Amino acid sequence: MRVWIDADACPKAAKDQVVRFALKRQFEVVLVAGQAQIKPAFACVRLIVVPSGPDAADDYLVEHAVPGELVICSDVPLADRLVKKGLAALDPRGKEFDAQNMGERLAVRNLFTDLREQGQVSGGQAPYGDREKQAFANALDRILTRLARQA
């Protein structure tokens, strides 16, 4: 099994949680980034730095991840591409992307993008705290268990 991470936008705490699961459950973690990052010093972790460019890391993830694997990403359009390819996708706050919720997630994302562009909404997400870390760990455990059963 392999877990891919869109590393540029993923909080360090979430990346660290995936590595802890990987050490315990014996799977590979692939960090895909558009810029250099510090790679955790474990054999189960690989870092791939893609050439810079719009959506280069996203395109790499869509091209290389295969059904039965999990991708951690915050990017809703990327998650849509992954789900359509048959992959499991999870955001660092513990919300799984799936065929049933992608339409709604895309609509909400597009609405907030439009509102931000019009100056009607400012700011971003709440800080990544203990509640988000716990929700992510719970969802990660649930999805990894499901994928292991399907393998």
UniProtKB/Swiss-Prot annotation:
Transmembrane segments: none
Pfam families assigned: DUF188 (PF02639)
Listed name of the protein: UPF0178 protein PFL_5989
Organism annotation: Pseudomonas fluorescens (strain ATCC BAA-477 / NRRL B-23932 / Pf-5)
Family to which the UniProt record says this protein belongs: Belongs to the UPF0178 family.
